[in-house]
Amino acid sequence: MFPVKVKVEKSELEMAKARNQLDAVLQCLLEKSHMDRERLDEEPGKTSLDTHNKDCSITATGKRPSARFPHQRRKKRREMDEGLAEGGPQRSNTYVIKLFDRSVDLAQFSENTPLYPICRAWMRNSPTVRERERSPSSPLPPLPEDEEGSEVTNSKSRDVYKLPPPTAPGPPGDACRSRIPSPLQPETQGTPDDEPSEPEPSPSTLIYRNMQRWKRIRQRWKEASHRNQLRYSESMKILREMYERQ
């Protein structure tokens, strides 16, 4: 009789426990519907996702919620409303994504935001911290037309935003000639018909003649490059003075 009595007591305890869990679930559903209706009446634009998560966590324990639970939820909702009011309307909308164990709130950026601020916020890994909007850098002040000529003379005492243009290479269409020298004409030695022709030169003689010609061509290229650099002498002077000021 003793084992049978223990089995009966165990079944009664399980039945009482199941009834308590059922009562807790029903009571929680009633309070949830009441709070959802109250929230919809007060704040029609907000959802009750947080309330649902809290209710589910309570029902999972199988205990009856306390009598002060609605009061705590109202207090929590009041604190959230105050936080939203202090943070401004921009904190109400969030779109947080998680990528490689780091999170970023994309709702704070617009379609024209560069990629670098988004990467910087992702590296910070703080979705609740908003990226401060930086004012665009001021453009360079326009240079008046009457000051372009005096820019070279006053380069020591003022900032330089524009270098003077190079001098004209010469007549129109000679810009290419200032960089490329004129070709060197080959040396031809004509022989009269009545004189016998010279024998063919040896390879060493040909190499010597070609080396002399190559040297003259290289010297002509050096002279053309030097003449072209002289066109930028004013700009080089300004850059040299800026370097010496440092």
From Swiss-Prot:
UniProt KW Transferase keyword: no
Entry's Gene Ontology cellular component terms: Myb complex; transcription repressor complex
Compositional bias (Basic and acidic residues): 36-55
Residues in the signal sequence: none
Positions carrying Phosphoserine: 135, 138, 182, 202
Residues found modified as Phosphothreonine: 167
Modified residues (N-acetylmethionine): 1
Biased composition (Pro residues): 163-172
UniProt superkingdom: Eukaryota
Gene Ontology BP terms: G0 to G1 transition; gene expression; negative regulation of transcription by RNA polymerase II
Keyword Acetylation: yes
GO molecular function, one term: protein-containing complex binding
Glycyl lysine isopeptide (Lys-Gly) (interchain with G-Cter in SUMO2) cross-link site: 5, 7
Pfam families: LIN37
Keywords: Acetylation, Isopeptide bond, Phosphoprotein, Ubl conjugation
Xref: InterPro entries: LIN37 (IPR028226)
Disordered: annotated span: 36-90, 127-209
Complex formation: Component of the DREAM complex (also named LINC complex) at least composed of E2F4, E2F5, LIN9, LIN37, LIN52, LIN54, MYBL1, MYBL2, RBL1, RBL2, RBBP4, TFDP1 and TFDP2. The complex exists in quiescent cells where it represses cell cycle-dependent genes. It dissociates in S phase when LIN9, LIN37, LIN52 and LIN54 form a subcomplex that binds to MYBL2.
PANTHER family: LIN37 HOMOLOG, PROTEIN LIN-37 HOMOLOG
Protein name in the entry: Protein lin-37 homolog
